[in-house]
Swiss-Prot record:
Pathway: Isoprenoid biosynthesis; isopentenyl diphosphate biosynthesis via DXP pathway; isopentenyl diphosphate from 1-deoxy-D-xylulose 5-phosphate: step 5/6. It comes from Bordetella parapertussis (strain 12822 / ATCC BAA-587 / NCTC 13253). Pfam families: GcpE. It catalyses: (2E)-4-hydroxy-3-methylbut-2-enyl diphosphate + oxidized [flavodoxin] + H2O + 2 H(+) = 2-C-methyl-D-erythritol 2,4-cyclic diphosphate + reduced [flavodoxin]. It is an enzyme of class 1 (oxidoreductase). The gene is ispG. [4Fe-4S] cluster binds at C320, C323, C366, E373. Residues 1-24 are annotated as: Disordered. Its EC number is 1.17.7.3. It comes from the Bacteria. Binds 1 [4Fe-4S] cluster. This is 4-hydroxy-3-methylbut-2-en-1-yl diphosphate synthase (flavodoxin). Its cofactor is [4Fe-4S] cluster. Converts 2C-methyl-D-erythritol 2,4-cyclodiphosphate (ME-2,4cPP) into 1-hydroxy-2-methyl-2-(E)-butenyl 4-diphosphate.
Length: 433
């Protein structure tokens, strides 16, 4: 008879399980610059958060306003569509408006079909952008495609701009795909069509990067992406791509969708890759709800990186989901109120209180886990549940400090949080690991 080992017995020579993401894959460092600001993608730099406007770029005022909103939300690079002469003509004006507002976030021009013409005809547009996104699948076919691609790379070299070669399965080079399918038909054991498509995406990205280098673009001025809209395909494509090259990689699940579906799908795909050390910059391609806030994609990107422990952007609130023990929705309202308060304060706190972005706050709804979670947090409050004494103890750095009662618990706790931030981080005390 076999017996299971008693898990309470100490193990000789046992090591604790590894915690944390795998080491980042080694990539070249690409510098995206504007004014006095440099955002490094790849190398040893942190994973960069990107976003994209959905305004008509020909409307310079609306586009500049949205770029500012995205930058203030935390986007470190913002991409804008450049699809018409009218749009290209306004890019320099958008850049000028942003500079006047003190917004030095680098702009990336997103080009399809006619980018070679627009960059050539509007040199002020080419200069005002910090980076170009090129989709080799939307540049025509045969020699025309090669000439158009070469023309865009020549402009990038002339203006010393980095380029993202972004391949998308919705616009994959038809000639390349046909060739890959033909090669597959001659295999002893042909691959399924989806596998051929994934291979074609990777081949397209890398071969175009090599061609760009042959045309004179520096290897440290190239970023690659291969976007698909299915989670498992994206994971497989980027694993393959990362194994075949050392260019920095831009991650994103294209057409992720709306609301919770888009957030869940993007998180499921990107979290796996980031955990494996793959990915140097990310963008969450959410379809906004009607009248929704475009900055939502920035917040989701930040939350993915922060919850994985890869970066810290804003203090995070831990809150219980609620159950039959919680007597009201007050703790939920308080958790939401505190998280919103923390985000509102971050533009000021980021410069005044270094390290505050790593602070953890707990807002709990009953005695079961409330005191424990509150002690684990930097600062926490445990609200009373059903049948409990109507009092809310506050814990600071693991110690119970004060008990709040009455109708003004929310206001009093917010004031305690603000005082704690000023005392702890204003004194230059770093966040405890």
């Amino acid at each position: 008879m076999r017996y299971m080992q008693d898990s309470s017995m100490p193990c000789q020579d046992a090591s604790p399980p590894d915690v944390g993401a795998a080491p980042r894959r080694a990539t070249r460092a690409v510098r995206v610059q504007w004014g006095g600001r440099t955002v490094t993608v790849g190398g040893n730099a942190s994973v960069v958060v990107q976003s994209m406007t959905n305004t008509d770029t020909a409307d310079a005022v609306a586009t500049a306003i949205q770029v500012k909103e995205l930058a203030q939300a935390g986007s470190e690079i913002v991409r804008i569509t450049v699809n018409t002469p009218e749009a290209a003509r306004e890019v320099a004006a958008i850049r000028e408006q942003l500079d006047r507002m003190g917004v030095e976030v680098p702009l990336v021009g997103d080009f399809h079909y006619n980018g070679h013409k627009l960059l050539t005809q509007f040199p002020e547009c080419a200069q005002a952008l910090s980076k170009y996104r090129i989709n080799p699948g939307n540049m025509g076919g045969g020699k025309r495609r090669d000439d158009n691609f070469a023309q865009m790379i020549e402009v990038a070299c002339r203006h010393d701009k980095p380029v993202r070669i972004g391949v998308n399965w919705g616009s994959l080079d038809h000639e390349l795909m046909a060739r890959k399918m033909d090669e597959n038909s001659r295999r002893a054991q042909p691959w399924e069509a989806q596998a051929v498509m994934r291979d074609a995406l990777v081949v397209s990205a890398i071969s175009n990067a090599r061609r760009a280098e042959e045309l004179g673009l520096r290897s440290d001025a190239i970023v690659l992406s291969c976007k698909v809209s299915h989670v498992q395909d994206l994971i497989a494509v980027y694993r393959d791509l990362s194994a075949r090259c050392d260019y920095p990689l831009h991650l994103g699940l294209t057409e992720a969708g709306m609301g919770s579906k888009g957030i869940v799908a993007s998180t499921a795909a990107l979290a796996v890759l980031l955990q494996e050390g793959i990915g140097d910059t990310i963008r969450i391609s959410l379809t906004p709800e009607p009248g929704g806030d475009r900055t939502r994609e920035v917040i989701v990107a930040q939350e993915i990186l922060q919850t994985m422990g890869l970066r810290a952007f804003t203090p995070m609130v831990v809150a219980c989901p609620g159950c039959g023990r919680t007597s009201s929705t007050f703790f939920q309202e308080l958790a939401d109120s505190i998280q919103s308060f923390l985000r509102r304060q971050m533009p000021l706190w980021r410069t005044r209180y270094p390290g505050v972005e790593s602070m953890n706050v707990a807002v709990m709804g009953c005695v079961v886990n409330g005191p424990g979670e509150s002690r684990h947090a930097d600062i926490g409050i445990s609200l009373p549940g059903t049948g409990e004494v109507p009092a809310a103890p506050v814990f600071i750095d693991g110690e119970r400090t004060v008990t709040l009662k009455g109708d003004h618990i929310a206001e009093e706790f917010q004031a305690i949080v603000e005082d704690y931030v000023a005392r702890r981080y204003g004194a230059g005390i770093t966040h405890q690991e």
